[in-house]
Amino acid sequence: MLNDISICMLTLDNIKEKVYFEYRRAQMEAMKTERLGVIHVSDVIKPCMRNVVYNKITPHTMSTEDMKSLYFGQIVHSNSMIAKPENNEMFLAYNYVKDEPLTREEALKIPAEDPEHLDIIYGSIDDLIEIDGKWIICDKKTTGSIDYFGRYNSKPSESHVDQINRYRVLLKKCYDIDATFGCVIYISNKIEKDKRDIPIPMAFKLKPIEETLADMIEKSRIIKDAMTECTLPERTKCYLCDGMCPFASTCFEDNRKKWKE
């Protein structure tokens, strides 16, 4: 009798709500990835170090639209291996103070709160492939603007080019492999029945390692000082300021020297 009552109490709305939140939970689980350290390649490609520091000291929140984009990207990355297994998702960790690489095992042994992490730049290469004796660093990017990249005269995003140039530096430091070309593969995150699904690879030559390394170290030192001394780097007028920085309204009025007294 009690079982009959409990079945009667279960409504279609109850089921829909339960399934909805279970799906959202599954999305969150799928987006979890191992992320060691403090300073990452995604930090040292930014034009504004204040943006980077705000991002590290501010609690992270995410809208469902942000989740959708990240979730789709994670699914694509985990199910589209372009390179051989040993050259897919290549771990990168470089101590720029000691000029030494670290293996994943060595990095994992460093406690999360150890300040040594501030001496290390971390990253991960999607795929490294070899064509006619030349190494090419490939990076997959999902986008809602596939039509833009599909134009005959389009170029890859500058930030994506900068990212792969930094991967070149870490690849040489960590594996002694010198890649001279990069390729961003743009993949549409939209499903449109009236359009063909066409991934768009965009290849380019990479910059000299020394030039890129100097910029990486300079930015890493700014981040290290900011996190160690609790200081705020100078704001930098750049493309992020207008509509692309979630901290803009804070930054415009924030004249503090320190983010923590």
Language-model features, listed with the residues they occupy:
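Metal-dependent nuclease catalytic cores that hydrolyze phosphodiester bonds in DNA/RNA
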Residues: 1-136, 144, 150
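Metal-dependent nuclease catalytic regions and adjoining charged, substrate-binding loops involved
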Residues: 4, 10-14, 104-112, 169-261
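Soluble or luminal CAZymes and related metallo-dependent hydrolases
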Residues: 68-76, 159-163, 215
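Metal-dependent nuclease catalytic cores in nucleic-acid-processing enzymes
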Residues: 78-84, 131, 153-186
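Residue-level preference for long, well-ordered alpha-helices that form the structural scaffold
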Residues: 117, 156-160, 205-212
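Short coil/turn motifs at secondary-structure junctions
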Residues: 132, 143-145, 187-191
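Short helix/strand-bridging catalytic loops that position acidic/His residues to coordinate divalent metals
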Residues: 146-158, 203
